[in-house]
Each structure stands twice: as C-alpha cells, then as structure tokens.
C-alpha cells in the first residue's frame, strides 16, 4: 500500500510546481541514461551488488545479499527556472536481512528495539521523493531550492551511495553515522546560493532517523536544522564544512545531537576511467562527549575495465556496546575506544550483459582495536566480500558528484 502523504512537506510538494533544486546539499546523482519527452527530460541511473559477505571472528557472520540503488529524475524548463522531480529508491528491505548486513564494528539504528552492532541496516525503499528548482541570477550567481517528503539536508560530504570514490565498495563506511547518515531524512527544505566557487546552503528537516519499517515514510515536524559551506576552487576539487542540530535523532537515546563535518573531495575523469578520493571527518556531540569518525578513501578506474579501491578509517566506539551487542545503559560509565579499519578491493568489468555494465570484484577488510575486545572479535579478523556489480545507465551506473 503506498504511503500516505501528510504533514508540512506534503503541503509544500503538493502545493508548488517542481523545479531543478540544488539537491540534498551539494550533490545529487545525475542519472545517466535519458530519453526525450515533449516537455520533461527523463533520466535514470542505478546499480546493484550481488555479493557473498563473510565477516570473520566470533562476532562475524555470513550472508548472500544485494546492496542496490536507483534514481529517476524528470527535468523541464519552467520560465526562468529549471524544475526537477527526484526519486531515489532501494529494494534492500527485500535483499538484506531485517537485522542488517554483517559488518564488523558498524553501529547505528535498531532492529526489534535493539541497537544494531556489527550490522549495517538496509536502506529504505524511498531514499528521496523531492522537487528541486534552480535559477541563474546576474553576475554568475544562482539560486537553488529543494523540498522533499524524504531527502538529504545540507550536512556532510556526498553520501557514500552517491560518491564516485565509494562506487565500487560493496559495504558502507564504519564512519557512516558520523558523516552522512542524514542522507535519508524526512521532510527536508533546503535553500542554496552559489557565487563563483562558493555555495552556501541551509536546511530545515525532521531530525529523527527513519524507523525500522523500511517500506514507508516517517513524517514529522521541521524540528532540526543544518548548514553547509562548499568551495569548488577547481572543477575536480570540492571542500565542504557543515553542521547540523538534530532533534531526538536516535530511537534508543534521549536528547538532541549536534554533528560537525569537514571534507575534501577530488574527482577527475580520465581517458581510461576516473580517479576519485575523499578525506572526511565528522563529530557527533553526545552527552558523554564527542564521538569521532574519519576516513580516507580512493578509487581508480584505469584501462576502462580495471578498478582498484581502498579505505582507511578511524571511529570511536563504546566498549560495553561492542562486548554486549546492545545499547549501553545510563547506569554504566562510557568507555570509549578507537577502532581502525582498512579495506582494499579490486573489480574487473566483464561483458556479461548487454543492458548493463557488469563487473566482478572482491574486497578484504581488517581492523585494529583494543586488546579488551579480542575475546569477542578475535586477534585480527579478516573479512571478505566477493561480488558481481551491475550498473545501469550510459555511464554504467557509476555515481558522481557535482
């Protein structure tokens, strides 16, 4: 049954004609393949991993799963404006186990009212349902407006499902909930202004994380806010700093949360493919103190068919939660520890399907952590993914940043 449209964002979207907005913050995937219609220009983009996921050690697990993503954009001129309708979708609620995909040291969201530890939750069916407007102004400036029943507020770097440097990784970053977990938020309104190399954006949105039902929308008050400053000193270089204040974001944690992020991204197309990298760090301000997550990731496609990629991360975790696999009670003193992660992978494009770009790949990951965690994680776990990746669209479903 389709979700009911109600609340403040429904009023905005149903009462206003749509246009091409500066998307969730500074970046929206521009779908690749397109077809011309009398008024609207339609474009689409998508990818799907089919992978065998083996997480090592006593806290590990195994699964056969599919991480996937699709986006549809309809664009048309509307007077002085450009108008777009944006839809982003995933069928991960059907292709990933309800309790999430095995991923050592991951933390965030819930299943059955219990905090997910060593699991990456599935993304919602509706990742974005939004309208967007852009308008050029004098002296090389432009205005962007964005409104979505679900979308991405102006905080963080490009979310990992959409950025080129992460396009071949079959797993989420461990720092996801420090950097870009707001990429699926309910009831988002964003305004942005660009002058030369500078873009300033501000958002209002509903701060609570989506609930455990991954098939619906979760509407609420515009109770949270975000802002971002982005610089593009070179076509390939993007620098952003951002912050947001979220009202009661976590189902199991009382209180509001402040997040601050900064990142430097590089993306360059080449004759044989691309080179892309991201250095990012984010901090969640919690009652027990700051919680940091940082990463450096890169991907290089060369000779058209070959991709090598890697990611280095450091994230803060709570010892009690990692040992007991549940939310730390307020009566237990927090014990923070740093976890370092390393992921390396390779993919090869193969001529399997005419309708899609297909690659076969593998990735390995290992972590360095506190000795106190060895009884529950082993001495040095080594996790492995082996996968097929299908990309749809004229660029093979490869994400990219604007």
Predicted regions and their residues:
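Residues on the lipid-exposed face of transmembrane beta-strands in outer-membrane beta-barrel proteins
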Residues: 46, 70-76, 129-135, 189-195, ...
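Repeated loop/turn-to-beta-strand initiation elements of outer-membrane beta-barrel proteins
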Residues: 79-84, 139-143, 193, 197-201, ...
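Surface-exposed coil loops of outer-membrane beta-barrel proteins
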Residues: 97-230
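Beta-barrel outer-membrane channel/assembly domains of diderm bacteria
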Residues: 26-136, 381-391
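Outer membrane beta-barrel transmembrane domains
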Residues: 242-252, 275-288, 293-299, 305-353, ...
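Transmembrane beta-strands of outer-membrane beta-barrel pores
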Residues: 48-56, 89-95, 147-153, 195-197, ...
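Outer-membrane beta-barrel "beta-signal"
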Residues: 344, 378-402
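Residues that define the transmembrane beta-barrel architecture of outer-membrane proteins
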Residues: 40, 62-70, 123-129, 183-189, ...
